[in-house]
Amino acid sequence: MSTAAAPSFLRQLFAGEIASDLLFPYPPPLDRRDPEEAETVRRLCAALNAMAASGVVDSRRFDEQEQVDEGAIRAFAEAGLLGISIPRAYGGLGLSATGYARVFGAVAAVDPSLAVLVGVHCGLGGKAIVLYGSEALKQRYLPALARGETLGAYALTEPETGSDAANIVTRAERDPEGRGWLLTGRKHWIGNGHRAGVLVTFAQTPVERDGATVLRPTAFVIRPDFPGFQVAGTIRKLGIRGSTQAELVFDRMLVPDDHVLGEVGKGFRVAVHALNAGRLSLAAGCAAAGKRLLGEFTRYAEARVQFGAPLASFEVTQRKMATIAAETYATDAMVGALASALENPAVDASLEAACAKVFASEMAWRTADELVQLAGGRGYVQPWPYERYLRDARIQRIFEGANEVLRLFVGLNGVQGPAAELQELAQALRRPLQHLGTLTGYAAERVASALGQRAGLEVPLHPVLRPHGEAFERQAAELAAAAADAVMTHRREVVHRQLVVERLADLAMELYARACTLARTQQLIGERGIGACGHEVALAELFCAQSARRFRTVHRELTGQGGATVDRLRLAVAAAVRSQGGYLPADALLDVPLPSPPAWGLSREAQEAAVGLVPAPSPEVAPER
């Protein structure tokens, strides 16, 4: 049976194959691959630490002022931190994905708001021009972005279109005078949007497909001095308050033809590839946050004495400490593997990027939540920083694609391989003599599955890791079988069975995290010897054991009757709640109507009133010079 043509560890895992060569051997540290780049990364990290020590970067100040001040941005520009993803040919540092991820993690550890600013500037806006810009666009805009003379932005999200990026409503039509494109629409939550001098945005354009005119997204490079561009205001937020998100208005904004990014009608490809880089950034930032927060967790637990002993001496605290450490180790392993995959243009790492983003963001949220819980009342109030950590962590599950949507993205893409195989099988069954080879191959696969034969890692693991490798192989086979069964059971309706697809994604995510963890730990053992890797082995063993247990729980829900029964009950209750607009039963103590919350109207005026747009300051950073 065939698998997806583009190499992808997860796509092949769904199809019952373990593409060991895509993860093993784990990529060596950067200083062994590129000593010169490693030295650059060290210099940048040292500059970041110096900025934090001197007060140039001050998370508390940024949070209270609700902006990153110009002094910090200038310091970043002077250090070269605004050109890390831009090739050297255009004045940047041209870091690899690995180097970029390491620097971005350091930025996130210093201040999450600055990480958002840098991520939007380098990882989204600048990266899209690097990947898809014409040579003229690159020459025109990348040097200024690399020097930090202006900031970059990435304007995709709209008031009515968040994760459903393919269905944006901003329209682009041809200018009657032939000067280019006229864009009309609004963009929401645009990081750096109020002071960026170069922005990448998206609009629906009419294109010909199969003899009919249809609307497809196109990417454009725009500037705030284009006629029709307006910043409606900036937005106050729960967390990452130092970063600024703006609402932009395009009122028949004129964009020249030479500012189309990529091809007309193929903007979705631009968005997806830029978001892969953005998801790497986010995962790297969350991994760094996990390391920093674990340090704070440990220090507080050792210092805080209750019942005559430090909190760190209690088993419940130690359980939390160990789980945070193991999950951070796994996240770090995923970031290293993903960065290496994104450096290989022949590899499709879109599913892996989505999994890393989901896993990392949820790890960071749990870690921040546990730190607040550990600190008790101090975790909830200022001037202690713990409540800010929690507020800053919350957005990660929404940025770069909401986690619920990314789970569906992973699950639905994963079942495409089994679906194609089963479609091929169905055709063979209609004409069995003409497709004897297909039937024989499918029968052989089923017989092998029944006999317990399965794809293997095909790499030597140290004996201490081997049991976890064998568990991985068993559960990889279970994922492939569950994906095939889901397609056979639900057929075309599988795309609507989101609870099933979500579980498949959770299984895949656990396996990917575990494979990365095993690969990295095996690499460390090979380099240092088992005697020098005791802590890493303990982390890997703990993570693999906990991950395998989570896998078994989800797999039982997916393949047993219990999960289907619970799903039916959930959908029935949800239907009743929807029909009544909320909670139905009478109050158990005394049935007294609750006060109604303020109405959230759906009109544009009501939304703006609810959000409370703040008039945007005049940009202090000039656009194109």
PLM region spans:
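Glycine-rich beta->alpha junctions and the first turn(s) of the following alpha-helix
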Residues: Q230-T328, Q396, N403, L412-P418, ...
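C-terminal helix-coil-helix/basic helical segment that borders enzyme active sites and/or dimer interfaces
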Residues: R60, E302, Y329-F359, V372-L374, ...
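A short core secondary-structure module
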Residues: R179-V231
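A structural signal for short hydrophobic beta-strand segments in well-ordered beta-sheet cores
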Residues: T170-E173
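Glycine-rich phosphate/cofactor-binding loops in nucleotide/flavin-utilizing enzymes
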Residues: T3-L23, H273, R378-L465, T559-R625
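Extended, hydrophobic alpha-helical segments in both membrane/secreted and soluble proteins
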Residues: G125, L137, T150, G185, ...
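Amphipathic, small/basic residue-rich leader segments at the start of a protein or domain
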Residues: M1-G119, K127-L151, S163, E458, ...
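Glycine-rich phosphate/pyrophosphate-binding beta-alpha loops
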Residues: P112, H188-H194, I395-E400
